[in-house]
């Protein structure tokens, strides 16, 4: 369902990193991370970072 990059972003969100920190770590722009998060939220039906983290934890994606 989620792409490998989206899974990587969710893992970093769960680790408590900000969008800017994630962008720096992955060599992307913060806007690209925003786009990844919007895509993730839409695919899994959530509206927040904490809900995305909970979703990933419940499905053992982390």
Q: Where would I find each of the regions flagged by the language model?
A:
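Helix-turn-helix DNA-binding segment
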Residues: 1-38, 42-44, 58-59
């Amino acid at each position: 369902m989620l792409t490998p990059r989206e899974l990587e972003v969710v893992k970093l969100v769960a680790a408590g990193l900000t969008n800017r920190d994630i962008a720096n770590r992955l060599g992307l722009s913060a806007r690209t991370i925003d786009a990844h998060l919007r895509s993730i939220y839409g695919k899994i039906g959530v509206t927040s970072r904490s809900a995305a983290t909970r979703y990933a934890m419940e499905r053992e994606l982390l």
